[in-house]
Amino acid sequence: MDVELEEEEERICLRTAEEGQLANMDDDKLVSDEVHLRQLSATPSSAFSLQHSRGSDTKEEAPPEGGTMGGKSAAPREEGEPDERVVLRRAVDKGAIALAQIDDLKLEGDDDDEAVVNGEEVDGLGLSNPAAQTTDDEQITVNGTGAAATSSVAADAASSEQDAASTAMATPDMSKIPRLPGDGAQMEDNGSGDLPPSLRASTTSILSNLRKKQQGGPLRGGVAKQTPLRVQSVRIVEAKRAYGPKRRTESCSIFGNSNFEHDLESGNSLASIPGQSQRPLNNEMYSAFKSGNVVKGILCPSLTNSFKQSSLERSYLTYTHRQRQKSLIIVNVVDFVLKIVLAFVWIMRRSELGPIESDDGTSMATAITWSVCCGIANMAICFLGYWRCFANNYLHWAAVCTWVLFNIQGFVGQGVGFADREYLVWYILFVIFVPYAMLPLPLKWCVVGGTITASCHLAVITIIKLQHGEATINPECVLFQIFANFILYTAINVAGMYTKYLTDRGQRLAFIETHKAMEHKKESEKELQRTQKLLDSILPNIVNNQIRSEMYKGTDPTVETQFNKLYVYPMDNVSILFADIKGFTELASKTSAQQLVKILNDLFARFDRIAEDNHCLRVKLLGDCYYCVSQFESDNWKTRPDHAVCSVETGLHMIKAIKDVRLHTHVDLNMRIGIHSGSVMCGVLGNKKWHFDVWSNDVIIANHMESGGIPGRVHISEATLKCLNDAYEVEPGNGGCRDNHLKMLNVKTYLIKRTEPLRPKRRFGTRSSAHLAGSVATAAPPCATPTALPKSISASGSGSIGGVTATGNDGASIDGRSLEYAATIAVPAQQPTQLLQQQQKKNISLNSLPNVVEGVAMDSRRIRNGCGVMGGAGGTGGGGTGPCGMSTVSSPTAMMSAPLEVQLRPRNGACSIQNLAEAIDGKGLIIEDESTTDWIPEIPFKNLNSPEDGLNRADSILVDTKEDHRVSVAVLDEEIDEFIEQNIQINSNKEIRREYLNPWTLKFKDKSQEQKFCQLREDMFRSNMLCVFVIWIFMVLCQVIIIPRCTRLIICLSVGTVILTFCCVLVMAEEFPGLPRCLKTNSAKLVHQRQRRTLFICGVIVSMCMLSAIGLVLCPSSTYIGTADEHSRFLRMVSPYSNISMTEKEFKLNVYLSATIHHNITISTPASGGPTPLVDITSSGPSDEFVRSTLNALTLNLTPPLPQSHRPYTLTTNGHSVSLSNLSYSDASVMQSSSDVEGQCAHPEYLVFTWVLCLVSLATALKLYYLVKALMALAMVAFYTTLIMMKFGSGDSFSLVELSRLGMPLGVQMLILLISFLVMVCYHARLVEVTSRLDFIWKEQAERELTNMKSNRALNDTLIKNILPDHVATYYLSDEHTDELYSKMHNLCGVMFASIPNFQDFYSEDIDNGKACIRILNEIICDFDELLEEPRFASVEKIKTVGATYMAAAGLNHEHLRLRGETSEDSVCDLVEFAFAMKQKLEEINGDAFNNFQLRVGICSGPLVSGVIGARKPVYDIWGNTVNVASRMDSTGENWRVQVPENTAELLCSRGYTCVKRGEIAVKGKGMMTTFYVHPKGISESQLISPVRMPAGIPLAQTPNLQRQTSHHGSFSAVVFGMLQASKRSTAIAGTPTGTPSPQIRRGHRGSTFSSVRLSQKSTTVNPVRRNTTRVRGRSYRQKKSSSNNSIVTQASSSYMPSFRRIDQIETTISKSHNDAL
């Protein structure tokens, strides 16, 4: 289990099981809802959503399977709980409860025995949960943790532990599975946080019932419940079927649980309650990290603060580094300004104290040079950081350079104005803090850098102290100073590390949302691409684009209108080709189902390639019939001028391809090809199973051209012959002798003499780019001697090329039509584009050729040996990669009569023809015709999940799908990382900030978004306060060490420590159940309420600020600096030997005891060589001589940072000034002044260092609003500045002067330090604020992208289910069989062909090119499609429509029949009932529109084969003798009758149907067959009415109109419309609420294009509006509720009258044209 849990933590799937659970039928709806309910109930968050109220007369039952949800045992309530909410809160952490335990909960107010839940009656099924009564996931509120509040106290401890142990292994802990935003686990997007009434419960009543349950007493109303039978059946079925297709699980990432819950008492979403937001921190939220646990709400820091997934870690580092681009620049700017300020102070001090001696020029030049170089380095790093390219890839190295530069400055200290190394403690604090707060470096790097800086500086100070003997004279003071430095460095490191850790951890959690947003966006785009691929595979691009453009700017097609939208478009001057396989029935009888589908897929895939290469477009597959139409340009709907040639070439290639199949299968197969040219209407009809189709009289003629054709020959009409322009030799076809329709229309037909294609297909290879790159990677051999082409190559494909004979595949000539090439091929390698230029000069148009490759592939990198060759053989027109490596293409000209010569002229190093022939092989870029190459047929839907265009041949051939599946996970991760690289750019962050945030306040411009952000729960608040408390402890230690023996200070610090300890306890009180209730209540308020939290943090920081500075006021000056009394004592030691009256103002030593620059001088004598008290050497001489002798003997033994000496010093005494010239001073040693003799340390600057820690503690409050932080920091620095000016600048307190002219006053130095940290803290606050708000935006986008992804996935599923039956769609969506052909053998199925035979008589192209008539057909087919939505026809599947023929089948899904308890015979009966319903529906249409359409139905039952064929245009089809017989039953049937063969009639008679024998009839291909007419059940032969009086099969009494029902899959137009809305959402502005616009009710006026009136001489004045009443009855609910509905209908009716009068006026003419046609 541990291994499984670890693996689960590594990758947590994005897609949950709830996403695809929608039942197909109404009977399955409860099953789906129950399973969805059970899955949601598997998390403790759904406890309150699953409270069932039961009656008192039921019995208790055992918990269902998997009753203990989450696998955790329930625990009894502990004693002494002071608050009921505490019990619930504690239950959250204890585990989940069983469903049965939830069922036993009796809600408050359930005193009676009625099954009522908060006023709502339980339905008859016993399901009171609204989640079981709806399929809307958004209505099912999932409570993250609050719902689990009752789990730990629900049952006895022992029993629950046993239950948990028994189910833990079988039932996974669903509570640990993260809930994605928007899938029902979060209510943030719902707009209202209120739960449904039946989901609300009283906490008091729940707890009281739980206590009763725990104590063993029965609950009120007592008794347990009996599960309803239907629910039991649901649970039985649940284990037997899979609900919804399996989805891909590769797009997985590592996400923590969702952070949304609901209030336990009110049931409201915490996101909607002010001050309440996400759930508290727990370890589950950090399962994606390598380490770092949460203990009592405190994040335990860890140096390995990284993701477990390396790719995710790399993406995050890139993400966070780019966010700190500006901070890197700010740090270097601050350091640069700091150098300028130090230099300015140094210049000011020099101007005050006088010029420096000339011998210091070299040292000063070094200092200036050092400062200038460091400043240049700062500016260089700034420019690199500003450079976008560098910042996007190498920003962290610029940060490392910054850190190195700062350390060099701190340890060398050679800059102008810099003090000695041991006095640069303030700068080292700055250097340690900067990487944590500002630099874009990982946490581990920051810790290592801070530790190195601190350790090195401590070592430097210690070494310097030891070298100069200061540790010997006063070891205690040196030790205190070193220890104080250690505390300061440790405090800065700890504060910086923990702040960086908390900031980084918060950013990582937000980055997960960011990564999720990007992943969802990528998935959404993939889903949309897959949907578009599927749509492109169904419809041609031109029709697809036209439909999309109309839908994109149109209204929602799902809104009911009076007429269905018609997507039909006219096309003129096209050629239609029909091809039928002769001998297919024999082939089907000799092969298995899998073999037959494989053969058909191979054959039709070849036909698709042939059609595409010859610029033809496949229309549809009709069993073994294939028909296509010549293509047209997608931009202007213009057809090709050579459309007839393209169609003939397609037919000839098909005949050639069938020969190969005949050789392999040993079956007499052949092709009958019929071609006719004319105009068509192209588009789609109906609402279900859209298929591209064409309609016109010319299409019918083309169909009969195929029927009247000859196998193995291309049969063309006279219209086609006129379009060929004598390109082919023909002979009379006499098609009228073989087809009556052609004879009736007097169509002259011809046969193409050629049996081989005029243009043998020669095309590019289909290898992938990787394979091609590998094949060309090898260098070509050296070019041989030049060889010319001595003679031309004929169009037959044979010819001699330099002694090498090149023979085409067909070997036949082109009947005198020579295609001889005269193009010069030898081209210099330096100018490969001349190849194309030469062809253009000779008027060779690559785009105008029917079977030529699309372009010329040239790559200069592949040119070898400075030569390039382009060769073409005869009419084969192809391309190849010569030995020189240049990829070339040639093709035959479209102008047949233009002779071209091909010559290879020698040139410098030109390749030989032999090398050219070697280059053009099976591995090259040229592939011969199908018969000479091994071609792998494409698999349908193989490219469904491919990341690139599925129509690209390189994607569908020579691709190892298994290998692709193995690397799919890694590829997906790389794609997401690359996607993040492209989207999370520096400029992207800047654009988002400008778009969403106010540039000054950083608040969201959208107030609702700002309010939502302010309601976020601050889970790091406790960790922040703990860090503040630790910093305070360090501050106390530092002040106690530096300021000893100050009782008042110690008391104040102790009181402050107690106060801060109480504050920490208050913050942590919510995690400790034993604390008083008031503490826990206030603790919860601090976490949830932003305003309280802000005031609390401000109070704590202000307290720390005041307490840290109070020592400067309360403590005597003697505790931290030498005072006047100390100087007087020192002078009184000298007074016995001098008559000078010494006072503190008379003796002013020009020695400034600054802790960081020049103070604490050691006095040594040359004789002793060691430190000697000054009193021992001042016992002789008068005052002037005493001063001179004393100070001349004074030597300073330490090395200065700047090698300067002989600095003038002045000693003033009794009005006399003595110049001291030969003096040196120490660089950084902290030594004793006159007070050091008594062992006292003077380090006032360490007080300021503790003040810096206060500023750092302010930075640790991460979620404090940045303006509040900035104002507090400014106030603190102003307060500290006042203290510095008052104390450090007072002459009374500090009667000291500067030691040297280069020295800096302590007050100025401390001000620089405070200002530097002020800038860092303020910018860090702004950085954290910007980052948190950007992360919040990304999180919102993640939720929107998830919604879009789910919508796109639903569209994709619906789309594929409109292409395929549900069970076949499930097969392909499972992603387990995408490399296999789908085929299945069915023993018994029903097949129906229902046609409207008189529609052809009705059809006329006189009005709008026949579009008006097609509109009527569309209405009829849409009504037929609506019948399929009825539950009684669940087993009936629409296959396709062909013209006015509707094809359907029943019994194809055996599993569905088994679940419904039906047999295959029942499905055949359902199909018959469907035929009767179609007849009734057509009668209604006739009655409404005053038409007389008639229906003719043929049904046959028996075995058949189903499968999916066609890789580029996959279609589901059925084959077999049953299908053929059903088609013949239709074509030989009678109007208004259902004709069946004998075996089907026997089956139907056994099921109660009346079958009347028709007799034996002649059936094409079957001979004589006995057929029957089927009548509805319950009608005997004696009751049948004569067919003369009423058509057979029409019910005597009309049943009520069938209302239009909502489709479970949705109409196809609704799918496309939804896809377009998804694309709109994907291009919408991020951050704004996205969603499908509310559809507008389209009340279109039926004007001149209205075609729903029978075009006959019958008057239309009675009811001019066709089907007005039925359409009004079928309106949507919104239209029914419209108050102006009646007026709209009346107005519409009156407005349509003129149009119908116009139609009436041309009725006579149309009727005459119809009669003439007959």
From Swiss-Prot:
Disruption phenotype: RNAi-mediated knockdown in sugar gustatory neurons results in reduced sucrose response and no alteration in response to water. RNAi-mediated knockdown in the pacemaker dorsal lateral neurons (LNDs) results in reduced Pigment-dispersing factor (Pdf) response in the circadian brain neurons evening cells (E-cells). Isoform B: Results in reduced sucrose and trehalose substances response and no alteration of water response or bitter perception.
Extracellular side: 349-366, 419-422, 467-476, 1045-1048, 1116-1241, 1285-1301
Protein residues bound to Mg(2+) 1: D580, D624
Known EC number: 4.6.1.1
Tissue expression per record: Expressed in labella, particularly in sugar-sensitive gustatory receptor neurons (GRNs).
Record-level GO BP terms: adenylate cyclase-activating G protein-coupled receptor signaling pathway; cAMP biosynthetic process; circadian rhythm; detection of chemical stimulus involved in sensory perception of sweet taste; intracellular signal transduction; response to caffeine; response to sucrose; response to trehalose
Cofactor: Mg(2+); Mn(2+)
GO cellular component: plasma membrane
Principal location listed in the UniProt entry: membrane
Family under the similarity heading: Belongs to the adenylyl cyclase class-4/guanylyl cyclase family.
Identification of the protein by name: Adenylyl cyclase 78C
Species whose genome carries this gene: Drosophila melanogaster
